[in-house]
Amino acid sequence: MFGVLNSDDHRAAIQQRNILAFGRTSSELWTSNPTSNYWCETRGNGRDSGQNRVRRPMNAFMVWSRDQRRKVALENPQMQNSEISKQLGYQWKMLTEAEKWPFFEEAQRLQAMHREKYPDYKYRPRRKALPQKSDKFLPAASSTLLCRQVLVDKWYPFTYRDSCSRATHSHMEDQLSSSQPVNIANSLLQQEHHYSSTSLRGSPETLATHLSADPPFYPK
């Protein structure tokens, strides 16, 4: 009985070990894309699925800065990578054409090897993440006050002289301050229509009084 149990445990342990070993090993896949037929290695998790990116060949500056970056990083371990790049860019600009020429030759050699190894290679830049909008909106109280002032100035641009007009204006301000921003426009339209129709139904004497409230303006 113990021999049967030991054999079963041994068989299960072997299967588990094989599964783990299969997950760790990398499988070589031949890509089906005719524009990039080259061997690539992918992990057992299958995330890459044979879509490993081919790096661009280095240019002259990259060839020169490959060793220089390591040297600057060793001399200044606290310096950030962005600062190292700025310093290397400045040093590269200070070099003469004769000093740069060996690195241009090396870059041309690397580009020729790259074309020979990947004849159908096409550069495909990665898409940059869209920056988040940093528009700052006004607070609710400030935006409500601003909207109220703009709407009042738009619908009542004339000067109020009689007590009825002042009362209407103060009533409008109270409604604008207490109402929701969504219903402001509808309320103004309804009250403006009601005020206009009421004024038109008045007597000719009332209309004449309102028209003669402001003195006529004569240009000089």
Swiss-Prot record:
PROSITE patterns associated with the record: HMG_BOX_2
DNA-binding region positions on the chain: 54-122
Keyword annotations: Activator, Calmodulin-binding, Cytoplasm, Differentiation, DNA-binding, Nucleus, Sexual differentiation, Transcription, Transcription regulation
Keyword Transcription listed: yes
Origin superkingdom: Eukaryota
Localization per Swiss-Prot or TrEMBL: Nucleus speckle; Cytoplasm; Nucleus
Pfam families per record: HMG_box
Cellular component GO terms held in the UniProt record: cytoplasm; nuclear speck; nucleus
Annotated family: Belongs to the SRY family.
Known role: Transcriptional regulator that controls a genetic switch in male development. It is necessary and sufficient for initiating male sex determination by directing the development of supporting cell precursors (pre-Sertoli cells) as Sertoli rather than granulosa cells. Involved in different aspects of gene regulation including promoter activation or repression. Binds to the DNA consensus sequence 5'-[AT]AACAA[AT]-3'. SRY HMG box recognizes DNA by partial intercalation in the minor groove and promotes DNA bending. Also involved in pre-mRNA splicing.
Subunit structure: Interacts with CALM, EP300, HDAC3, KPNB1, ZNF208 isoform KRAB-O, PARP1, SLC9A3R2 and WT1. The interaction with EP300 modulates its DNA-binding activity. The interaction with KPNB1 is sensitive to dissociation by Ran in the GTP-bound form. Interaction with PARP1 impaired its DNA-binding activity.
Protein name: Sex-determining region Y protein
Origin species: Callorhinus ursinus
